[in-house]
Amino acid sequence: MVAQLYHHLTILIASIYIIFFVNAAPTLYEDDEEDFNSTEYDVFLDSDSFQFPRRNSSCNCTREEATRTLLEALKRALQIIAGYINETDTEELPTYPPTMTTPLETTPLDTSPPVLPSAIP
């Protein structure tokens, strides 16, 4: 269940990244003579709008529309995640081996002072 939650959070973060950074980025062409002061780049830099939902589309949406779309996507993602959290697990908890009831047999520690080899007759 936790793995599913992390999976959905990862998808959510990746989606947000794609929506706001990949789709809003200016289209870079392989032509070295491309003018980076084009209107597409200016639209990206404009604080009131950015390209949404496709990079090459000519329609732009305002920040309010983008925020509304993002909030709807977040709401839907949170509903999906909440559905997983609220599910009751019918699985039983795993059983572990019982604790040892009898101590292991051990030899008592020898606490007598050491006998020096010169003291042995």
Curated annotation (Swiss-Prot):
The keyword Zinc-finger does not apply. Residues 91-121 are annotated as: Disordered. Its main location: host cell. Residues 98-113 have a biased composition (Low complexity). One of its GO terms (cellular component) is membrane. The chain crosses the membrane at residues 9-29. It comes from Alcelaphine herpesvirus 1 (strain C500) (AlHV-1). It is a single-pass membrane protein. Keywords: Host membrane, Membrane, Transmembrane, Transmembrane helix. This is Uncharacterized gene A4 protein. It is found in: Host membrane.
